[in-house]
């Protein structure tokens, strides 16, 4: 008899709630990511996805709930979360523009080096050994993402897609067990998106669990073992890609449904009911409108005499006031 062991959870978020004054951005969200798993997090703009990421990584202190990594509840401090084994990227690129590609990756190694300030100043044998090991590890990561040949280039000179890759390499430099990617393909063309998809699979093959936010549905459904959908800060549904993309609630969250009393909502309900019954709804009657009353034409005034009136000098004077010398002045002011 063979026994199968359940996958061990790397991340356990329980009842995570985040309030900003009277606004609840995340409400009672539970999410688990297992070892060697890729989990997708989707939802419309403003659903609370990045806020949830910030709660996981210690940038925000959750109002309620807890976050545990490999069974240990994490303190809400970013450097301690990184040291524990969770790394992340951000929606917007946050590279050090005036540092080289290699130096950017070395920045991500600081949580894995034991050398302190005085060691760096004195540059003793221990420091030099640790520095050489960090450079070797950084170069290995650049080789992994295909940027080893650009190690000495300034990061600002890299194409957009390569800057995104460099951010991932910097996050991996901290040797995480869980990698959080916030919209890693934003702004990419289809070729770059496909390359990123292959990179994430390669990261998973290294034993690193991945939790990824993305709006590219084809990318996220091809990539993920499970997908969770957030709507207005709450987890709406969670399951496999096939289950989530076919869920009517998810479709409604993205495309919208007419609310009660909305223009056209009643007509749409009638059409849907008729389609369900297999009949065609009768067209709505157009209310008759009363013809507007035509005012009677006023009879033209008949002059008292048949002789046509002649214009006097007063009739030909321009409109306006007259000064003491008889010259005309405009209502707007005297003409120059």
Residue ranges and their predicted role:
Residues 1-17, 259-336:
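ABC-family P-loop ATPase nucleotide-binding domain
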Residues 2-277, 333-336:
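Glycine-rich phosphate-binding loops of nucleotide-dependent enzymes
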């Amino acid at each position: 008899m063979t026994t199968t062991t359940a996958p061990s959870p790397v991340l356990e978020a329980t009842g995570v709630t985040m309030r900003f004054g009277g606004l609840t951005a995340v409400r009672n969200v539970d999410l688990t990511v297992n070892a060697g798993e890729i989990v997708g997090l989707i939802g419309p703009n403003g659903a609370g996805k990045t806020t949830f990421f910030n709660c996981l990584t210690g940038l925000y202190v959750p109002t309620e709930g807890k976050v545990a990594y490999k069974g240990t509840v994490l303190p809400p401090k970013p450097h301690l979360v990184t040291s524990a084994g969770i790394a992340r990227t951000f929606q917007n690129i946050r590279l050090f523009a005036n540092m080289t590609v290699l130096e950017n990756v070395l920045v991500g190694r600081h949580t894995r080096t034991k050398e302190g300030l005085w060691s760096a100043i004195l540059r003793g044998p221990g420091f030099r050994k640790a520095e050489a090991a960090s450079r070797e590890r950084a170069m290995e990561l650049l080789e992994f993402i295909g940027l080893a040949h650009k190690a000495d280039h300034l990061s600002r000179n890299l194409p957009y897609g390569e800057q995104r890759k460099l951010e991932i390499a910097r996050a991996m430099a901290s040797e995480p067990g869980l990698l959080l990617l916030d919209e890693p393909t934003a702004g990419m063309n289809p070729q770059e998106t496909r390359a990123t998809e292959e990179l994430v699979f390669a990261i998973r093959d290294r034993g690193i669990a991945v939790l990824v936010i993305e709006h590219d549905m084809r990318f996220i459904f091809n990539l993920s073992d499970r997908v969770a959908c957030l709507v207005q800060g709450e987890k709406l549904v969670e399951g496999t890609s096939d289950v989530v993309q076919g869920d009517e609630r998810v479709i409604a969250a993205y495309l919208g449904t007419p609310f009660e009393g909305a223009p056209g909502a009643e007509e749409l309900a009638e059409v849907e009911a008729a389609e369900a019954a297999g009949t065609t709804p009768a067209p709505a009657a157009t209310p008759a409108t009363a013809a507007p009353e035509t005012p009677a034409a006023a009879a033209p005034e008949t002059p008292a005499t048949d002789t046509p009136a002649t214009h006097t000098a007063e009739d030909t004077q321009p409109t306006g006031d007259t000064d003491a010398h008889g010259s005309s002045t405009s209502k707007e002011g005297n003409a120059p």
